């Protein structure tokens, strides 16, 4: 099972290297990684997605706490949260496919960030499912390049049932 870990670290040289070294020694692949400043000065938030069962992730969390500069580690896999990714995707187009490609961009509320006679660069922001869905739809045009961030997230503080909301959005098409 894929687990999402949110790790707060002191923003100092070598912290990410020590974390990735720990994962490498344990034979773990990091499927997704995003690092950036947190709300406190001198603190960074690392969001990573790793594969493993619950027991293995617990052990990994304990090992992370043993590293210098680790302030907090939280497995947020089953905690309601707001998740986002960003993807830039360059596709081939021509006069016959341009309208269809632009319609897909509109439906997904993506943005055209560059356009030429024979290509589009599209910016898509959303949950991982949205990113995968638009990528699959754009495959038929001929994907030239993709750049995709890792997942970022913040834990929700409200008690709103997000699965219920997702189902309502799909049901009403908004």
Swiss-Prot record:
It catalyses: 2 pyruvate + H(+) = (2S)-2-acetolactate + CO2. One of its GO terms (cellular component) is chloroplast. The keyword Nucleotide-binding does not apply. It is an enzyme of class 2 (transferase). Dimer of large and small chains. Residues 4-78 form the ACT domain. The keyword Phosphoprotein does not apply. Keywords: Amino-acid biosynthesis, Branched-chain amino acid biosynthesis, Chloroplast, Plastid, Transferase. Its EC number is 2.2.1.6. Belongs to the acetolactate synthase small subunit family. This is Acetolactate synthase small subunit. The gene is ilvH. InterPro entries: Acetalactate_synth_ssu (IPR004789), Acetolactate_synth/TF_NikR_C (IPR027271), Acetolactate_synth_ssu_C (IPR019455), ACT-like_dom_sf (IPR045865), ACT_dom (IPR002912), AHAS_ACT (IPR039557), AHAS_small-like_ACT (IPR054480). GO terms for biological process: isoleucine biosynthetic process; L-valine biosynthetic process. It is found in: Plastid, Chloroplast. GO terms for molecular function: acetolactate synthase activity; acetolactate synthase regulator activity. It comes from Pyropia yezoensis. Its main location: plastid. Pathway: Amino-acid biosynthesis; L-isoleucine biosynthesis; L-isoleucine from 2-oxobutanoate: step 1/4; Amino-acid biosynthesis; L-valine biosynthesis; L-valine from pyruvate: step 1/4. PANTHER family: ACETOLACTATE SYNTHASE SMALL SUBUNIT (PTHR30239), ACETOLACTATE SYNTHASE SMALL SUBUNIT 1, CHLOROPLASTIC (PTHR30239:SF0). Pfam families: ACT_AHAS_ss, ALS_ss_C.
């Amino acid at each position: 099972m894929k687990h999402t870990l949110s790790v707060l670290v002191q923003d100092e040289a070598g912290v990410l290297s020590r974390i990735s070294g720990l994962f490498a020694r344990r034979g773990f692949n990091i499927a997704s990684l995003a690092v950036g400043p947190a709300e406190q000065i001198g603190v960074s938030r690392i969001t990573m997605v790793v594969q493993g069962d619950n027991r293995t992730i617990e052990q990994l969390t304990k090992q992370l706490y043993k590293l210098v500069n680790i302030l907090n580690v939280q497995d947020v896999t089953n905690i309601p949260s707001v998740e986002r990714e960003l993807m830039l995707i360059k596709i081939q187009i021509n006069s016959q496919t341009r309208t269809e490609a632009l319609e897909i961009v509109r439906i997904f509320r993506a943005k055209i960030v560059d356009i030429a006679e024979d290509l589009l660069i599209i910016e898509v922001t959303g949950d991982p499912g949205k990113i995968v869905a638009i990528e699959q739809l754009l495959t038929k045009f001929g994907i030239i390049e993709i750049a995709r961030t890792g997942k970022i997230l913040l834990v929700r503080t409200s008690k709103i049932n997000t699965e219920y909301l997702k189902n309502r959005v799909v049901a009403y098409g908004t």
